[in-house]
Amino acid sequence: MTSSRPIAHNTKNKQTKTLKGRDYAVFLQKLGYTFKQPDLLREALTHRSLGFPNNERFEFLGDSVLNCAVSTLLFKRFPSLPEGDLTRLRANFVNQQALHRLASALGIGELILLGEGERKSGGHHRPSILANAVEAIIGAIYLESGFAVVEQVIVALYEPLIRQLDPDTSGKDSKTLLQEYLQSRKIALPEYSVLLAQGDPHAQVFHVECVIPGFGIRTRGEGTSRRRAEQEAARQAYELAIVRH
């Protein structure tokens, strides 16, 4: 999906700041995307205090695109999480606080286009304005290049955050991650117990339960050894602990 629509500009309420210079170049590098139609980005960075057109419609679109992309990312990355936990985890990644942090990392505050009153009142630091701008930029990328491209941009931006929750890419095994997480919150360590060992001695499958009384979490893992089964149970427990607590 691409867009080549003309963008009208309100000449009555012009903002003298232009999208160029070092801040702009650094922003594009961090974003990992260069607009073929710079006016799309300008509108995505234009707050309603500057007049019309502004970024509210782009924000509306970007909100839906972001939710879809993050939902897909979490669905693929955490195959054992149930729907409710995926929903809570997604909310942690797309809420205003998370988007504000992302906007700050991208340097959007230096580029946002504001009306005089909003600018004087510190609007370029306001979390809601910056969070909305992130969604608007995502909407603009979607309009210009379609979902496949904007999804790649979103995944690249969120990958460092997702990696922190993913035992497979953290460099530590699941039991260690779970133990460290619980210790940091002064929660009693998990209890592991073998529920069942099936099969011949040379080809057994172990079923292990992991219980965290302090969090009310109970998970089960299986593997060809007790250790592997414990690791699988710990992985599931860690994911649940991160999402719920």
Swiss-Prot record:
CDD domains: DSRM_RNAse_III_family, RIBOc. One of its GO terms (molecular function) is ribonuclease III activity. Its main location: cytoplasm. Gene3D superfamilies: 3.30.160.20, Ribonuclease III domain. The lineage of its organism: Bacteria, Pseudomonadati, Pseudomonadota, Betaproteobacteria, Nitrosomonadales. Its EC number is 3.1.26.3. This is Ribonuclease 3. Its cofactor is Mg(2+). PANTHER family: RIBONUCLEASE 3, RIBONUCLEASE III. Digests double-stranded RNA. Involved in the processing of primary rRNA transcript to yield the immediate precursors to the large and small rRNAs (23S and 16S). Processes some mRNAs, and tRNAs when they are encoded in the rRNA operon. Processes pre-crRNA and tracrRNA of type II CRISPR loci if present in the organism. It comes from the Bacteria. It comes from Nitrosomonas europaea (strain ATCC 19718 / CIP 103999 / KCTC 2705 / NBRC 14298).
